Design a protein with these regions (language model features):
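Polyanion-binding surface elements
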Residues: 176
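Bacterial N-terminal signal peptides
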Residues: 8-17
Length: 222
């Protein structure tokens, strides 16, 4: 979650622009629920019992101390904001992350995508808006090591310690249909595509499709 706060100033800048909203513009805050998926790259990581602890290994070799790396998936939570400067043109920012950690061989990981976009809305009417998004951002994979520590046999705690991160630049594009269900409240099914050069270091492809449903509130007249 700390990574989200790093980009809080950008969302604050959008918030400061709310007073400028009028009948030809508007400001949205939204939250998304969805998933992003890509396969495993087929590599492995040695366990602490391996002759090469936490080193790269081949699961196909049949070594019981070599754990395969996973595919990317699971639940993603999103936070975003959009500012429509004109009826058909605007800017926005999004961050999508896994709220909980998942296993990555003997490690754990949490994935984050963030992007800053230009928005083109060829359809922008009272009850519906078609959004076409395109921009740049980053992808961050944070790794940690979980360990159980016990005092005697009565008290045990699960300790998770960060062991590193992998950061990549990304290109982002997306399309969504924003449906206003009650005055300023909306629902937006959205499909996103992230192209992350170097992402094959962690997963099986540099191409990451994502599907989400966003809900939010819009300031400004519809």
């Amino acid at each position: 979650m700390k990574r989200i706060f790093t980009y809080a100033p950008y969302f604050s800048l959008l918030l400061l622009s709310i007073p400028a909203a009028n009948a030809q513009s508007g400001f949205d805050l939204n939250m998304g629920f969805g998933t992003a998926r890509v396969g495993s790259n087929g590599s492995g990581i040695g366990t602490p019992a391996s002759v090469n602890p936490f080193g790269v290994c081949s699961p196909a070799a049949g070594d019981p101390t070599c754990q395969a790396t996973p595919s990317l998936g699971g639940f993603f939570l999103g936070f975003g904001g959009d500012l429509m400067l004109k009826t058909h043109f605007g800017v926005g920012a999004e961050a999508n992350l896994q709220p909980s950690k998942s296993d990555y061989g003997p490690l754990q990981y949490r994935q984050l995508f963030y992007d800053f976009n230009g928005i083109y809305a060829p359809v922008n009417r009272k009850r519906v808006m078609l959004q076409l998004q395109g921009g740049i951002g980053g992808a961050r994979t944070g790794f940690s090591l979980a360990d159980n520590e016990c005092i005697g046999t009565a008290v045990c705690t699960n300790v998770s310690q960060g062991v590193g991160t992998s950061n990549h630049f990304q290109w982002h594009t997306g399309v969504g249909v924003q449906l206003f269900v009650a005055n300023h409240f909306f629902v937006r099914p959205q499909f996103d595509y992230h192209y992350v050069p170097g992402f094959t270091q962690q997963f099986g492809s540099n191409s990451v499709p994502q599907g989400s449903v966003w809900v939010g509130y819009s300031w400004g007249e519809r």
